[in-house]
Amino acid sequence: MKCPFCGSLDTQVIDSRANEAGDAIRRRRRCAACDKRFTTWETAELRPPQIVKTNGTREDFSETKLREGFRRALHKRPVSTELVDAAVDRIRQRLLTLGEREVPAREVGELVMTELKKLDKIAYIRFASVYKSFKDPDDFRDVLEDLAQGPQAGDDPA
């Protein structure tokens, strides 16, 4: 590691500890050339996947765009910002842990539907009507029947 004070590459680790969450390591280092001490942090770099849209184009995952989708679906609904933030974080974390470089937009949409179903049934119906391009009242009826049946096998109970 290059010393930030003198630029020397001759540094030694004198202390190394994991943070409380266990997802980063703090290292105390000493430069052999100038004897100054400095701290470095080591974390894993997880890059979100590219989203492959239905027309085949690719775009970077956008947490802002995801939040905006939740905001539109939850417009004038009694759901706290904290709950939305938690849902967005779960989706982001899920996408990161997939380990895939590309994820179909359809898969992101399904994750949003799962989260909205837990947060607010009306928002779920709103989102589903746009996401699944409802054409007639029967499409709404199908979703309402699905909601009335309760959780299905494979639905996340959290």
From Swiss-Prot:
Keyword Metal-binding: yes
Membrane-spanning ranges: none
Keyword Membrane attached: no
Keywords assigned by UniProt, alphabetized: ATP-binding, DNA-binding, Metal-binding, Nucleotide-binding, Repressor, Transcription, Transcription regulation, Zinc, Zinc-finger
Cofactor note as given: Binds 1 zinc ion.
Ranges in coiled-coil conformation: none
Superkingdom to which the source organism belongs: Bacteria
Ranges where the ATP-cone domain occurs: 49-139
Residues in the signal sequence: none
GO molecular function, one term: zinc ion binding
ZnF segments: unnamed: 3-34
GO biological process terms held by the UniProt record: negative regulation of DNA-templated transcription
One Pfam short name: ATP-cone
PROSITE patterns from the UniProt entry: ATP_CONE
Cofactor(s), by name: Zn(2+)
The protein's role, per its UniProt record: Negatively regulates transcription of bacterial ribonucleotide reductase nrd genes and operons by binding to NrdR-boxes.
Alphabetized HAMAP family for the sequence: NrdR (MF_00440)
Family: Belongs to the NrdR family.
Name of this chain's protein: Transcriptional repressor NrdR
